Amino acid sequence: MNTYVLTAIAVLASLIILLVGRNAIKSSKKKPFQKHLLVFFGSGGHTGEMLNLLNALDDKLYSVRSYVAGSDDTMSVSKASLLSNSLPSVKSKIFKVPRARYVKQSWLTTPFTAFWSLLGSISVIFWNPFGIPDVILCNGPGTCVFICLLGYLAKFLGKNVKIVYVESFARVKSLSLSGKILMPFVDRFLVQWPDLATKYKRAEYIGIVA
């Protein structure tokens, strides 16, 4: 994972300048009181945790949503579709992005898949038909790192994006690599075990959401 993160950091600034620019910061077609929420489904148990979190959200406030999943993650796409159909008052769209790294993938080829994942993430954040999201809600490994870092960069382009990262239920005593990377960049870092909140100052204990 370190390899593709370093690759992302190396090309991120130039990609934003060349492919996005300040013209990407535009008003979306949503009412002033509506918030555009971007949700990343990290597959498997991560998706289950995210669905539980979404059940607690106010549909009226977060009535514009972008659901993002890996391009090969049919389960998460199916779950997102079911959620979208169950909330007719919510305007939503499902996006698929390439995975940053596949299970058991060689580290030698990871920079290449990571690069395509980064490009897909740029499209979801900066060329989204709903506009740049107001809130990004992420959990899970891999691609969510790009999503959150791009949201952080959007702040320097004039968009006040709030980024919330939820650490996995499986992380009881220590943070995941994604969590360690993202902690300095997110607005809220939520954990499901009290020991993590004690160990890391920025971590907020919210209880079990799995």
Swiss-Prot record:
Database matches in Pfam families: Alg14
InterPro entries (UniProt xref): Oligosacch_biosynth_Alg14
KW Nucleus (keyword) present: yes
GO molecular function term, any single one: protein-membrane adaptor activity
Lumenal side, ranges: 1-3
Membrane topology designation: Single-pass membrane protein
Residue ranges, Cytoplasmic side: 22-210
Assembly information from the UniProt record: Heterodimer with alg13 to form a functional enzyme.
Protein name: UDP-N-acetylglucosamine transferase subunit alg14
